[in-house]
């Protein structure tokens, strides 16, 4: 650990924060606004552990693991480009810290199966990803693996979208049950609901790699325009002369994220009076998105010229994460009579 990092650690006193992202494809605007911007701010005030959740990727993409390694490298480049600092935050790959799997295994000894079956996303993802066989032990148990990810570092806070709050509540229940059996080893973390976490995709559903409706952080200006100009809008605006209502328009959500108050007011007035069409309405929003992505992409290009940068970041992150994980697992093994 560098002197600068040690000083930074000592100046941050708001508790440990843990979060991760699955390397199942290119990061997109949903990740940027729903997680990454928040992570960049959190690292200023908290000890942060951000990890590439490659084992979690296998819970749904087990039949096609070929992209995990390259997606991991791309994800680290994106993280660095948006402002995550490896001298401040611990950036690592889940599978390189085997204590995640060990703690998951030990938790599986004490957690009732119905606790996992009642997690809302268990049924929701099975419905949404019907082309995949998700009747696996790994998929059923992935919320418990999330609990292990969080509790391994004794996180105080977990930044999540509102739809992920049940996972945090499960983690709190896991901590309580373990502590009741074996003594006070784990704190109960709290969920931090991230504003702007739900970014709509081009089809109006939540932006997701799985749905093919995402604007990637690496999309150039032309690709951003092509995707967003086709984004669905208020269904009442079938013709240019039909008035609409921004509250029923998925594209307006991006105006709320990216545009100024005056720009939103002009768009709202134009939509409700049909004085502007949907294509014209989107122009200013598209330009704002392009303006935000341009410097991120430039920083990313600079990072790609630094040979071995992702490997260096992950190696240092693994070292720091492993030190904490080993300490926690020493306590766990002792509490469970495994020493």
Feature annotation, model-predicted:
Residues 2-148, 297, 301:
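N-terminal Rossmann-like or analogous alpha/beta NTP/dinucleotide-binding catalytic cores
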Residues 29-31, 166, 172-339:
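Conserved nucleotide- and phosphate/pyrophosphate-binding catalytic cores
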Residues 102-104, 118-127, 131-181, 185-203, ...:
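Classical nucleotidyltransferase
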Residues 113-117, 152-159, 259-267, 297:
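Short helix-capping/linker segments at secondary-structure and domain boundaries
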Residues 76, 83, 111-115, 155, ...:
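A generic secondary-structure signal for well-formed alpha-helical elements
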Residues 23, 158-159, 213:
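A generic structural motif
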């Amino acid at each position: 650990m560098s002197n600068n990092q040690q000083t930074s650690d000592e100046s941050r006193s708001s508790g440990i924060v843990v979060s991760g992202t699955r390397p199942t494809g290119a990061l997109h605007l949903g990740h940027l606004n729903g997680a990454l911007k928040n992570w960049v701010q959190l690292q200023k005030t908290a000890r942060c552990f951000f990890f590439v959740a490659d084992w979690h990727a296998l819970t749904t993409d087990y039949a096609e693991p070929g992209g995990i390694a390259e997606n991991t490298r791309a994800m680290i480049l994106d993280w660095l480009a948006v402002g995550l600092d490896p001298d401040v935050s611990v950036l690592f790959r889940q599978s390189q810290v085997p204590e995640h799997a060990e703690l998951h295994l030990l938790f599986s000894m004490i957690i009732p199966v119905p606790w996992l079956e009642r997690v809302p996303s268990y049924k929701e993802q099975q419905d949404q990803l019907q082309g995949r066989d998700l009747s696996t032990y790994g998929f059923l148990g992935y919320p418990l693996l999330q609990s292990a990810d969080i509790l391994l570092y004794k996180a105080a806070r977990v930044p999540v979208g509102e739809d992920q709050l049940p996972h945090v509540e499960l983690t709190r229940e896991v901590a309580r049950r373990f502590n009741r059996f074996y003594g006070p080893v784990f704190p109960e973390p709290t969920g931090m609901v991230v504003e702007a976490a739900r970014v709509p995709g081009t089809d109006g559903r939540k932006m997701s790699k799985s749905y093919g409706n995402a604007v990637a952080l690496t999309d150039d200006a032309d690709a951003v325009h092509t995707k967003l100009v086709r984004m669905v809008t208020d269904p009442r605006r079938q013709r240019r002369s039909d008035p609409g209502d921004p509250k029923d328009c998925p594209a307006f959500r991006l105006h709320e994220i990216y545009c100024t108050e005056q720009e939103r007011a002009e768009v709202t007035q134009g939509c409700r009076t049909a004085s502007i069409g949907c294509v014209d309405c989107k122009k200013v929003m598209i330009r704002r998105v392009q303006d935000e992505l341009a410097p991120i992409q430039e920083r990313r290009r600079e990072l790609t010229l630094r040979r071995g940068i992702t490997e260096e970041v992950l190696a240092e992150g693994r070292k720091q994460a492993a030190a904490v994980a080993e300490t926690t697992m020493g306590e766990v093994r002792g509490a469970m009579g495994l020493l």
